Amino acid sequence: MQLLCVFCLVLLWEVGAASLSEVKLHLDIEGHASHYTIPWTELMAKVPGLSPEALWREANVTEDLASMLNRYKLIYKTSGTLGIALAEPVDIPAVSEGSMQVDASKVHPGVISGLNSPACMLSAPLEKQLFYYIGTMLPNTRPHSYVFYQLRCHLSYVALSINGDKFQYTGAMTSKFLMGTYKRVTEKGDEHVLSLIFGKTKDLPDLRGPFSYPSLTSAQSGDYSLVIVTTFVHYANFHNYFVPNLKDMFSRAVTMTAASYARYVLQKLVLLEMKGGCREPELDTETLTTMFEVSVAFFKVGHAVGETGNGCVDLRWLAKSFFELTVLKDIIGICYGATVKGMQSYGLERLAAVLMATVKMEELGHLTTEKQEYALRLATVGYPKAGVYSGLIGGATSVLLSAYNRHPLFQPLHTVMRETLFIGSHVVLRELRLNVTTQGPNLALYQLLSTALCSALEIGEVLRGLALGTESGLFSPCYLSLRFDLTRDKLLSMAPQEAMLDQAAVSNAVDGFLGRLSLEREDRDAWHLPAYKCVDRLDKVLMIIPLINVTFIISSDREVRGSALYEASTTYLSSSLFLSPVIMNKCSQGAVAGEPRQIPKIQNFTRTQKSCIFCGFALLSYDEKEGLETTTYITSQEVQNSILSSNYFDFDNLHVHYLLLTTNGTVMEIAGLYEERAHVVLAIILYFIAFALGIFLVHKIVMFFL
């Protein structure tokens, strides 16, 4: 259907001065004409500050045909629209019956009783908060002014720049459509601009004559379209380094749910960061595509909320989606220094904080996995309004402790557990990055457990995920551990040797893993540990094990001012290994804690399953050639029994040693196990031998008299 609208502005002269008293509208739709007269005073009441002169200039109805034709020729036209049949998912689930409906502008304590109470947030107030800012969506600059009328509206945006201001990207969005604009200034000072517009076809902004969307649309499926707006000259310039796969970009944007799409983009950014793409970003197809996809991730959440109209949005969906956006916002801030304005609801943040106040954080680990993840997402989303930080990190630690206690020794994390711990890690990351964590035991325990979970098999699984680009590379406890001994050669020795893994990909995975463990990262700093002040050079530290009342600092030199100093020099052949216990966080007064002590050996270590005599202790294993292998924190009798009843100790391998670190600062090497029930077994054997010997003697005596 072709629509022809002609606005006639009638100027009435009063007392020698021009004033606009009314607007007459003639509307002709396929031969059916209608006429409307709108009093100007009424129009001004609806749209205050509207200037008739500005409207007249913007309409540009006096433009001659030659100028219009020239403008039309400058704008890039697609060779044809790619039509794709795509399934559009139902993103926001139906609200449960009896759900509490919450107005984002009226959140208060007690509005929801707890995590078990179904709840939703009214769409209209929520959408208003997400798109709170007013700005220019469609600017009066070329090439946009050739194609669109100016548009100022409520919006949100993602903005970043590279090379100073020589390259800029802005992803501006309403709840209806997204416009991602690339702007590059060349060395000669020339400016090149290209925009990608994504949204429902019926909601895309109106075009100036003589343009129509079919000539600008690159891809279309059902309700959605992807449009390119630029000039032929600008397109040719961008095409030198930006050749996106528009079909794949469009297909993912349409078919993936908001949360899944945000996770997909997050994974791309994590891999990009690990490859050094944040420190020295390349202006290539991958980087520029990822920029647009970042803004699509934010848009899809806001768009989904807007599509519910006057309905209500399930709170669990909001927690999941905005958790992903929060994590995404953090990484683009770290990676590109990007700014995100809008797409934030103080009502949702307040509601999340109110709900978390009803949860006993220290008992979070006892809940089901689903409730743990829900609570941790709420904790991340509600962080700005939480007020008390230590409680949140206690919840993350409770979940990690529960997972650790039921996790098989030295196995890589399974998918569900990895996801739960990934969600919880962002409560910890935020506190570390914002420097709000005090010297409390929760963070020390969290990092100790993360260190214990960072086994050789876990490292191998993460390297496999990084090499293949799967989600297992997205998160590992190693990233938040207190292991500082992982060198490139050591990681290569732990990498899986599989035919399906390309060696170049494995090498890149190792480099990425090392980049993630960089000491320059805030989450890798040990400043919050009280014993940190006893370390003069962190680059010599191999591992830190914070136990109750004592922190063990394992290093390659003896320059740690601990309460004592142990050396494994008699067995550790390749390099020095020193263990410095810092008892009650008190450093030694001198430069070092005296001469190193030799570590005593226990040849017959009693194996017991009756009581947890080793609870609170740690076991540390190391190889004479490869160095530190892993540490195990004994948290419960179940963990202790699992260690003693498994193949944890391999005493046949004379190159591997096992050290027991106790809570009083003592270090012992376990060189053999003694079964507590061995004397019983020995007595039974001796009794059987004596019985057999007695039978034999009776037999001989009887035979002698026969």
Swiss-Prot record:
Protein name: Envelope glycoprotein H
Membrane topology (Intravirion): 704-706
Primary gene name: gH
Location of the protein in the cell: Virion membrane; Host cell membrane; Host endosome membrane
Regions of this protein lying in the Virion surface compartment: 19-682
Description of post-translational modifications: N-glycosylated, O-glycosylated, and sialylated.
Keyword field: Disulfide bond, Fusion of virus membrane with host cell membrane, Fusion of virus membrane with host membrane, Glycoprotein, Host cell membrane, Host endosome, Host membrane, Membrane, Sialic acid, Signal, Transmembrane, Transmembrane helix, Viral envelope protein, Viral penetration into host cytoplasm, Virion, Virus entry into host cell
Positions of glycan attachment: 60, 435, 549, 604, 664
Record-annotated membrane-spanning stretches: 683-703
Nucleotide-binding listed as a keyword: no
Membrane in keyword set: yes
Annotated segments matching region Interaction with gL: 165-229
Top-level taxon of origin: Viruses
Signal peptide per UniProt: 1-18
Function: The heterodimer glycoprotein H-glycoprotein L is required for the fusion of viral and plasma membranes leading to virus entry into the host cell. Following initial binding to host receptor, membrane fusion is mediated by the fusion machinery composed of gB and the heterodimer gH/gL. May also be involved in the fusion between the virion envelope and the outer nuclear membrane during virion morphogenesis. The heterodimer gH/gL targets also host EPHA2 to promote viral entry.
Topology term for the membrane: Single-pass type I membrane protein
Disulphide connectivity of cysteines: 278-335, 454-478, 534-587, 612-615
Organism classification: Viruses, Duplodnaviria, Heunggongvirae, Peploviricota, Herviviricetes
InterPro entries xref list: Herpes_gH, Herpes_glycoH_C, Herpes_glycoH_C_sf
HAMAP family: HSV_GH
Major subcellular location class: virion
Similarity comment: Belongs to the herpesviridae glycoprotein H family.
Quaternary structure (record): Interacts with glycoprotein L (gL); this interaction is necessary for the correct processing and cell surface expression of gH. The heterodimer gH/gL seems to interact with gB trimers during fusion. The heterodimer gH/gL interacts with host EPHA2 to facilitate virus internalization and fusion. Interacts with glycoprotein 42/BZLF2.
Annotated Gene Ontology cellular component terms: host cell endosome membrane; host cell plasma membrane; membrane; viral envelope; virion membrane
Gene Ontology BP annotations: fusion of virus membrane with host plasma membrane; symbiont entry into host cell
